[in-house]
């Protein structure tokens, strides 16, 4: 099983080393960039429509903002931290044995803080406009949303593995960030009208903290972590040769 490759890592190397701190800072900045663009697009839509109902054009705009924002966020962080920008991606990569536990926890902290910082900056920059928190649409139950988040995040992390983690790929340059941005945009078009299509606990956490809205917040942790974990385990176990498996450098996924 892939979990055979999980390593805890040394505190000195994975927490206090300058390279680890640089990687954590890169995750903080990349997540801030992504959440600022994604949540900012939602605030802009509410401003333009005077908090009107979500429209098809609004959903498309949200999908594009998140796809473009994630493409940039992953690209600028890829050579430093791997550009995870998502605790679910970090969790999936951890279960596949491609990052140590301590480095994963460090990334999680950086990602969550980056999201919170982005939302506080948005609140200040917009003059106190409400920060839209993730929530379920009318008629959508928590279990329905949970399945949506599991499936969508599975697709996202599977894409990360196929384009960025799998050692058979070599260097794909900008193809991996583009593919990752595309799958997020496509999933928002599919699930945005139901669960909000978070696929990322950090993306849901920042708005929840700033708006102090926690209703069904567990869905946006459980779903992405289950989906991301399953994708990491399945891809690593089925498609990556065990004999060729090795811990990736900390500058990669």
From Swiss-Prot:
Where is the motif named NPA 1 mapped on this chain? 86-88
Task: Write down which residues bear the modification named N-acetylmethionine.
Answer: 1
What is one process in the GO biological process aspect for this record? hydrogen peroxide transmembrane transport
Q: In which tissues is it expressed?
A: Widely expressed. Predominantly expressed in roots.
Predominantly, its location class is membrane
Family matches, as PROSITE patterns: MIP
Q: Show the SUPFAM superfamilies listed in the entry.
A: Aquaporin-like
Side of membrane Vacuolar, spans: 46-57, 126-144, 195-219
Q: Which GO terms describe its cellular component?
A: chloroplast; columella; cytosol; endoplasmic reticulum; Golgi apparatus; plant-type vacuole; plasma membrane; vacuolar membrane
Give compartment(s).
Vacuole membrane
What switches on expression, per the entry, is described as:
By NaCl and abscisic acid (ABA) treatments.
Select a single GO molecular function from the record's annotations and give it.
water channel activity
Q: Does the keyword Repeat apply?
A: yes
Membrane topology per the entry is: Multi-pass membrane protein
Q: Which UniProt keywords apply?
A: Acetylation, Membrane, Repeat, Transmembrane, Transmembrane helix, Transport, Vacuole
Which sequence ranges are marked TM in the entry? 25-45, 58-78, 105-125, 145-165, 174-194, 220-240
Residue span of motif NPA 2? 200-202
Signal peptide positions (record): none
Cytoplasmic topological intervals: 1-24, 79-104, 166-173, 241-253
Keyword hit for Phosphoprotein: no
Tell me the subunit arrangement. Interacts with cucumber mosaic virus (CMV) Protein 1a.
What does it do? Water channel required to facilitate the transport of water across cell membrane. May be involved in the osmoregulation in plants under high osmotic stress such as under a high salt condition. Transports urea in yeast cells in a pH-independent manner. Transports H(2)O(2) in yeast cells.
Family of this protein: Belongs to the MIP/aquaporin (TC 1.A.8) family. TIP (TC 1.A.8.10) subfamily.
Domain description: Aquaporins contain two tandem repeats each containing three membrane-spanning domains and a pore-forming loop with the signature motif Asn-Pro-Ala (NPA).
Q: What is this protein called?
A: Aquaporin TIP1-2
What species is given as this protein's source?
Arabidopsis thaliana (Mouse-ear cress)
């Amino acid at each position: 099983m892939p979990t055979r490759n999980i390593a805890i890592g040394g505190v000195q190397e994975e927490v206090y080393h300058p390279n680890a701190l640089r990687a954590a800072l890169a995750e903080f900045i990349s997540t801030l960039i992504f959440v600022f663009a994604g949540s900012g697009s939602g605030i802009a839509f509410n401003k333009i429509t005077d908090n009107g109902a979500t429209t098809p054009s609004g959903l498309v705009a949200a999908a594009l903002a998140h796809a473009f924002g994630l493409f940039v966020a992953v690209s600028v962080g890829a050579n430093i931290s791997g550009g995870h920008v998502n605790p679910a991606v970090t969790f999936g990569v951890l279960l596949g044995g491609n990052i140590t536990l301590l480095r994963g926890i460090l990334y999680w902290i950086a990602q969550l803080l980056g999201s919170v910082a982005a939302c506080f900056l948005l609140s200040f920059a917009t003059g106190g406009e409400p920060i839209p928190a993730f929530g379920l649409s009318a008629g959508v139950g928590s279990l329905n949303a949970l399945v949506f988040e599991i499936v969508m995040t599975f697709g996202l992390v599977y894409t990360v593995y196929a384009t960025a983690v799998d050692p058979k790929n070599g260097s794909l340059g900008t193809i991996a960030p583009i593919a990752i941005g595309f799958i997020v945009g496509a999933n928002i078009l599919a699930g945005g009208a139901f669960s909000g299509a978070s696929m990322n606990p950090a993306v849901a956490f920042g708005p929840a903290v700033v708006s102090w809205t926690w209703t069904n917040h567990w869905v946006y942790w459980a779903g992405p972590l289950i989906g991301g974990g399953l994708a990491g385990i399945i891809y690593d176990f089925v498609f990556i040769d065990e004999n060729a498996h090795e811990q990736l450098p900390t500058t990669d996924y």
